Amino acid sequence: MASIPGLLFSLTKPMDPTIPEAQFNDWYTNKHLVDTVNSGLASLAVRFKNVNPSHQWPYLALYRLQDLAKLYNMEFMSSLPTDSPAGWGVPNSKADIRIEPRGYQLLTTLERENAKTGVPKFVLTVEFRESFMNAEAFVASCQGLQLDDVGKQPGYRRSMLYQAGRSLVTQEGKAGTEFRSAEQQQPSYLVVHEFDQMPTNTFQEQGASGLWEYMAEYGTGLYRTEPVPVKVYN
């Protein structure tokens, strides 16, 4: 089976009040991101923080995946380091960090002419939890995003459209039973809008799930994923 490039959308929240925020961020940026990329799961990892300090999820990490199937392979995922923010080498647990991972396949990219490349300073995420549209219909419904109110925001670059990846790959063995369980409620589709500066409208009324500011990155190659032909999965 050919590799399916994808995205790991990972929401994170520190849970142990005895672990300073600076220690948590040091571990996540300088240990967890590095381990995830060096393991071969992702070629690039980028961290963002929510501009709303009281948001349910204060942090977001976007991992560019070369093969989405690895996310559902228990043998591979079990080989990843499980260090904790409580200390490098200390086993991870739900007591000190909460992570909600979601796997996606890139459908297509809509962008402004001459849009910048590289990691954006801000991303606005919009999730579509229940959708009876197939991928082709979803992409068609999003045509013109770069020209409407989102595209008119200062610093707008592009909009990247994703489809939930759980049904797109063969799930091997135990294949991350816990991961698949967490994905049962994940949105059917995701749109990531990129900006060079903070947009004046957060589009909360339109269903935006978060506005995120760049923190750090680790990996190789350009952040920007080249547009791909639309692939339809009913």
Swiss-Prot record:
Instruction: Report the domain of life of the source organism.
Output: Eukaryota
Q: What protein name applies here?
A: Core atranone cluster (CAC) protein 1
- The protein's gene is named ATR1
**Function noted in UniProt:** Part of the core atranone cluster (CAC) which products are predicted to catalyze most or all steps of mycotoxin atranone synthesis, starting from geranylgeranyl pyrophosphate (GGPP). The initial cyclization of GGPP to dolabellane is probably performed by the terpene cyclase ATR13. The Baeyer-Villiger oxidation near the end of the atranone synthesis, which converts atranones D and E to atranones F and G is predicted to be catalyzed by the monooxygenase ATR8. Of the CAC's other predicted gene products, the reducing PKS ATR6 might synthesize a polyketide chain.
Instruction: Please give the pathway this protein is involved in.
Output: Mycotoxin biosynthesis
